[in-house]
Amino acid sequence: MLSKKFTPLSLKNAAKCINNSLRSTYAITGVNLTRGLATNSKVDPKTYAPKPEFSSIAVREMLRKSCLHEFTDEEVATRIELAAAYRLFGLEHWNENILNHLTAKVEEPDGTASFLINPYGLRYGEITASSLIKVDEDGNIKHPGVTGDVFGINRAGYVIHSAIHRARPDVKSIMHNHYPYAAGVSCVKHGFLELAQTSHQSGPVTYHDYHGIVVDKGEQKSLAEDIANKDILILRNHGIITAAESVGAAYYLMYQFLAATEIQTHASANALGDMNNLFIPNNKLVEKTFDVTREKHFSGAKYGIKELSAYMRLLDDLDSSYRT
């Protein structure tokens, strides 16, 4: 005979254990033995997210919509190209979580400029042409895209882009990331080395000193001065920016530069950190390679056009929803 006295607390714990056991049985077998048990839970395990508007169901419903009919043909084309670039950044793991930014300039019917940027909260692999948010030079939203006011933009990040867009009317697209190899190069005193042919194709670089997270609009002037007329700006202790005449050019320039920083990192390791062990080509050879690759006849099209087009076809094979 059992002599142990069962208290209300022990009975409650026993019931809890039985309930958990039944739920485990359901998880393993698919047989729901808990049906009929009392529950106060209002959480739907299939749809729960920390905020309901950020749930898979809510976001997918938004991203199925298209608003491309509201824009000019030029803007639609730019939206599709920029959405493709976001998807490719995600595919290559060039982004840092949902951070970093790619922007593109579009001309309005009245001749003024607007800029496209990602909703702050979408994964790069979710971005569509219709989800891109249109802002003015100051980051004020002119068209929220299909996500409405759910996400908005990362205004701190736009400080960098707006500074360069203002200073460089020749630039259509700007891309920024913190890719580890590029960020690593930004942290060493000698900076970027033009070692292999890949680095010669990306062209000359310039630098901007670190002032913490770029949130101060007062820093915009020095950003504009530091990039000057170059297409690559290394943000010391931070990351990398490419700025170019098209989305394709900014994308392919980023591709080549990131590859070059990876080569430099491996070469430096192989050289045991001794600069004397590195073969660095002379400037004339570097300039020759750069000039050849930027000539239209080299590929038969403007820089970056064939490259972006090729990878848009890859995206079409994988998931063409970026075009929505």
Curated annotation (Swiss-Prot):
Q: Which GO terms describe its cellular component?
A: cytoskeleton
Task: Enumerate the SUPFAM superfamilies for this protein.
Answer: AraD/HMP-PK domain-like
Give GO terms for biological process.
actin cytoskeleton organization
What InterPro entries has UniProt attached to this entry? Aldolase-II_Adducin_sf, Aldolase_II/adducin_N, Aldolase_II/adducin_N_sf
Q: Which domain of life is it from?
A: Eukaryota
Q: What induces it?
A: By stress.
Q: Which Gene3D superfamilies match?
A: Class II aldolase/adducin N-terminal domain (3.40.225.10)
Q: Name one GO molecular function term.
A: actin filament binding
Q: Which family does it belong to?
A: Belongs to the aldolase class II family. Adducin subfamily.
Designated name of the protein? Adducin-related protein C1289.14
Where does this protein come from, organism-wise? Schizosaccharomyces pombe (strain 972 / ATCC 24843) (Fission yeast)
Question: Which taxonomic lineage does the organism of this UniProt entry have?
Answer: Eukaryota, Fungi, Dikarya, Ascomycota, Taphrinomycotina
